[in-house]
Amino acid sequence: MIKTTGLTLHYGSSQILHGIDFEAKVGQITCIMGTNGTGKTSLLKALAGTHPRSGGSVELAGEPIEVLRPQQMAQRGLAVVPQGRMIFPLLTVRENLETAFALLPKSEHRIPTDIYDLFPVLKDMTHRRGGDLSGGQQQQLAIARAMIMQPKLLLLDEPTEGIQPNIIQQIGHVLAYLKAKGGMAIVLVEQFFEFAYALADYFYVLRRGAVSVFGPANNFEKAALRAEVSV
């Protein structure tokens, strides 16, 4: 679904990513892990087309991509749940969900029934302002908003950060549901090891802006992978 070859990325004169070869396939959850400052979020931005790469190539469904505007991202079937959630605090839950309509044809301006099935708290709080929700509820709202776009590629940046355990478990169930539903590639940047290990089909571990190890989840002993991630 999405593939990079020799990807490099700079912020000013500082090189952040060094020759990244990466691939995420439909029907799989591909997890990017590593300690703080290893380039995980920068790689996600390069995949999303929201930050220009310095070198190498990125292909989405076999077609090269450059820096993309939100409308172009949606047209390519790409949705992002960024770190920090980025919901609109003064809009209601329903209005936040409806902001996804701006990136869809008018015929698709509806909230799918499975959104409220997967996130019942959003149905209960449909008229409450986004800023009044807890951090976990805001994260559910951000994921639901991305799902309304019916993406073929879903990118999530540390969705468990600062979230209470019961909502982390629910988010895990949602990602497992989306994977089983098919037709979507999921890329997950995550630092919560147990959450990632339970869900991911494929791992990339970054160290100092480069891939240190990668491979299918069943290739790794749990303790060995944990040790790689913590270096």
How would you label these PLM feature ranges?
Residues 33-35:
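The feature captures the beta-strand-to-loop junction immediately N-terminal to the Walker
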Residues 48:
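Helix-to-loop junction immediately C-terminal to a conserved catalytic motif
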Residues 146-147:
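ABC ATPase C-loop
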Residues 169-182:
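Helical segment within the ABC ATPase nucleotide-binding domain
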Residues 129-133:
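Conserved ABC ATPase signature
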Residues 154-158:
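Catalytic Walker B motif of ABC-type/P-loop ATPase nucleotide-binding domains
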Residues 56-64, 76, 108-117, 213-215:
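Conserved ABC transporter NBD signature motif
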